[in-house]
A protein has these predicted regions:
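Rhodanese-like catalytic fold shared by cysteine-dependent sulfurtransferases
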Residues: 1-60, 65-79, 88-90, 97-146, ...
Length: 313
């Protein structure tokens, strides 16, 4: 946290949101890497041409409590008779990858048909019929679009694209899902949250630990914090479709595939850590690792295999 404290001493970053979550099995980021990147997030065509620094072109940020109110209002709207058109249309848009949705998402959010954020094209389709685009045919002026992602950065960037396409009512969750789970607990959320580090997946309770300590102090004063208990979400095996015991992805053992997927124990053993039969017979295979360990660099497995073959011969 020393770096965060140093950063906040600069008046330009005094109000920056720093999010902290626990790493049960050791430090999730043991090394600090500083790299120059032309773009914070990767998009087809780059992002240099986007008006990212113009706040009016980005989605309007909602605090976690405001976001929760929007979701609850959306639920009430959906429960009204079909002929009642007095309320505004509300669309919940998950601006993440499909595999992230698979282990957890806000109730009512459709699974994004995206495997890499770079290829996201919501609201950009020119086809008359495009069932894969959740924004296709949406009334741009009379629909509130609620965008969310893990930490909020992808939404900030992508909302400028949608704004340029004429979508007028864009809202994003400030600080993303991780900030929401810390503040509001599991309300309206099901499952775990995918994270891009060795932890892979975190249950909402891990994010809410700090928030719960704050709640305990409030409850002593008789304040109802409104936290909800977690809703159970059943992930499905990518291979056979059965329920999985743990909401954590693994990479395909084939280095040339490397797909992130959920897998049941039976398929895991049957395919030796691969996502399909084709990958099972691929030439460059890594060993099946116990639990949800992450693979190391390919050369370590390649060299180990070469050494074994040399000794055998």
């Amino acid at each position: 946290m020393a770096y965060a404290d140093w950063l906040r001493r600069d008046h330009r970053f005094s109000d920056i949101l720093v999010q902290v979550s626990p790493a049960p099995c050791g430090h999730a980021f043991p090394r600090l890497k500083l790299r120059y990147k032309p773009s914070l997030v990767q998009l087809e065509g780059g992002s240099c041409h986007l008006p990212l620094v113009e706040s009016s072109m980005r989605a309007s940020p909602l605090t976690p409590s405001e976001w929760r109110e929007k979701l609850e209002a959306r639920k009430r709207l959906e429960s009204e008779p079909a002929g009642d058109t007095s309320g505004r249309n509300v669309l919940l848009l998950d601006v993440r990858n499909g595999y992230e949705w698979d282990i957890g998402h806000f109730e009512g959010a459709k699974r994004p048909n995206v495997d890499c954020f770079r290829s996201t094209s919501f609201g950009l389709s020119e086809q008359e019929m495009d069932s894969s685009d959740p924004l296709h045919g949406v009334d741009k002026e009379n629909t509130d679009i609620l965008m969310y992602c893990t930490g909020g950065i992808r939404c900030d960037v992508y909302s400028t694209i949608l704004r340029k396409k004429g979508f007028g009512n864009l809202y994003t969750l400030k600080g993303g899902v991780s900030n929401y789970l810390t503040s509001e607990g599991c309300a309206e959320w099901v499952g775990n949250l995918f994270v891009f580090d060795d932890r892979l997946s975190l249950p909402p309770a891990k994010f809410a630990e700090e928030g719960e300590r704050e709640d305990a102090a409030q409850e002593q004063g008789g304040i109802d914090t409104g936290r909800s208990s977690p809703s159970r979400w059943l992930g499905r095996c990518y291979v056979c479709g059965s329920e999985v015991e743990e909401l954590k992805h693994r990479n395909c053992a084939s280095i040339d595939c490397n797909r992130l997927f959920l897998c049941c124990r039976w398929c895991l053993e049957e395919l030796r850590g691969c996502c399909c039969l084709e990958c099972r017979s691929a030439p460059r295979l890594r060993p099946l690792l116990p639990g949800h360990q992450r693979y190391d660099k390919w050369h370590l497995y390649r060299d180990a295999t070469s050494s074994t073959l040399h000794i055998s011969s």
